[in-house]
């Protein structure tokens, strides 16, 4: 099961998000700069949180005697939520996007969206900062809980997944919607379809592919979770109806009245 991470596309997506800034600025970086980038406190915190989340989920699965996830598709979905929670929501969009916890990553964030260059509290970056703070404090922890729910086969998994997918899709709509209705003043748009390395990385990959991915996948998986929730909620009703069909209730009591002879007593 460990080797399957090498064929998981989202693993490559997260790794590329971490290492692309090094490749882009490789001519201006020294070996010490690269080591410093990879050992920044925020980077080490994300790595430690990833390890703790996986270890705690394994312990919980052992404690609840839950079987491991049986299919590659289920394990891939669980990894999607784990990596989204730790790498994307908490580390990149939250700590880096808002608090500039990594200088190199923060510079690259500003290259594809100038709103990330604004200080926290500045009106220009207010929309992305609100979305990113939601990722840091709501969506990130929620995704980690959902990964744990997958590993333990929790009965709360579908509800957590539906809510998580709704928040992810909503955040994407708010993020890109503000730019679309205002003419995209903060994005470096490839209007002339030049497809240079800069545009491929900072527009077509970061904006177009990223927004489509975070709209399509949450809507798809959220819809599946919604259908499972509806089916689960209607199951007790169907079960109750079938039980009443097998064991019909007794007929209501019938009352018959007969005339009573009343004797007049003295």
Regions found by a protein language model. Give the residues of each.
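Juxtamembrane "helix-exit" motif on the non-cytosolic side of transmembrane helices
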Residues: 20-31, 60-63, 177-182
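Eukaryotic polytopic
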Residues: 2-6, 47-49, 69-238
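Intrinsically disordered Ser/Thr phosphorylation hotspots
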Residues: 10, 14-16, 33, 44, ...
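Non-transmembrane, juxtamembrane loop and terminal tail segments
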Residues: 234-266
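Short alpha-helical hairpin
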Residues: 16-27, 111-120
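First transmembrane helix
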Residues: 8-22, 41-63
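Extended, low-polarity transmembrane helix blocks
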Residues: 54-68, 223, 230
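N-terminal onset of structured domains
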Residues: 31-40
């Amino acid at each position: 099961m460990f080797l399957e991470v090498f064929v998981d596309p989202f693993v490559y997506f997260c790794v590329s998000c971490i290492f692309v800034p090094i490749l882009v600025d490789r001519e201006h970086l020294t070996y010490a700069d690269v080591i410093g980038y990879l050992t920044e406190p925020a980077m080490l915190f994300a790595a430690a949180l990833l390890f703790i989340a996986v270890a705690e989920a394994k312990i919980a699965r052992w404690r609840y005697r839950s079987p491991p996830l049986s299919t590659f598709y289920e394990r891939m979905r669980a990894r999607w939520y784990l990596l989204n929670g730790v790498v994307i929501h908490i580390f990149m969009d939250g700590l880096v996007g808002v608090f500039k916890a990594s200088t190199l990553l923060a510079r690259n964030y500003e290259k594809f969206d100038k709103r990330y260059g604004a200080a926290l509290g500045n009106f220009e970056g207010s929309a992305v900062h609100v979305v990113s703070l939601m990722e840091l404090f709501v969506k990130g922890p929620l995704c980690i809980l959902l990964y744990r729910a997958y590993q333990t086969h929790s009965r709360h998994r579908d509800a957590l997944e539906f809510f998580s997918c709704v928040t992810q899709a909503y955040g994407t709509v708010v993020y890109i919607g503000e730019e679309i209705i205002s003419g995209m003043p903060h994005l470096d748009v490839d209007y002339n379809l030049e497809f240079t390395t800069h545009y491929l990385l900072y527009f077509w990959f970061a904006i177009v592919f990223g927004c489509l991915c975070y709209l399509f996948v949450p809507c798809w998986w959220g819809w599946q979770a919604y259908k499972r929730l509806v089916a689960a909620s209607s199951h007790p009703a169907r079960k109750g109806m079938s039980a009443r069909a097998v064991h019909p209730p007794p007929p209501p009591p019938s009352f018959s009245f007969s005339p009573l002879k009343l004797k007049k007593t003295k």
